[in-house]
Amino acid sequence: NSKKVKFYKKDIKNLKKIKNLFRGIDLVFHLAALSDVVPSIEKPIDYLNTNIIGTVNVLESMRIYNVKKIIYSASSSCYGIPRKYPTNEKEVIDPKYPYAFSKNLGEQTIAHWAKIYKINFVSLRLFNVYGTRSRTNTAYGAALGVFLKQKLSNHPFTIIGDGKQKRDFIHVND
């Protein structure tokens, strides 16, 4: 509801349709992406086009209009199955799925652009984001959404494994 923030629903794969939105801005908070593991296995080209080519289009739009700051919503999935918890940013990058690969390559692309075009960036490798609009239709990643759906339909919670697994969660407001 802030008057300082404007939301535009555009396709980041189309440079011509997005580039003029970057005129006169100070900072890009890049949240646009396809996100989900299973569909990325079924349609990897869609994920690569949106998450990599789309990110290049965001960066090119920034370059055209001399925008020098970007916050990128990356993904903890770039670590694959981490060797230790908690997982910090120095852990080995080992993406296991096209989604994870595409988000990590987006992060690398921003780092590369930052060197060439003197852009300041922060990349947030988010773990299991949840909130009021959490998806309830997938078993992977969106555990809280699945649990909410089970609760609202009076079904028991489904635990896969021995119940001792640990996951990090972050609320969308954080």
What residue ranges belong to the model's regions?
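N-terminal Rossmann-like NAD(P)+-binding domain of SDR-like oxidoreductases, especially those catalyzing
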Residues: 1-129, 173
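NAD(P)-dependent short-chain dehydrogenase/reductase
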Residues: 85, 108-168, 172-174
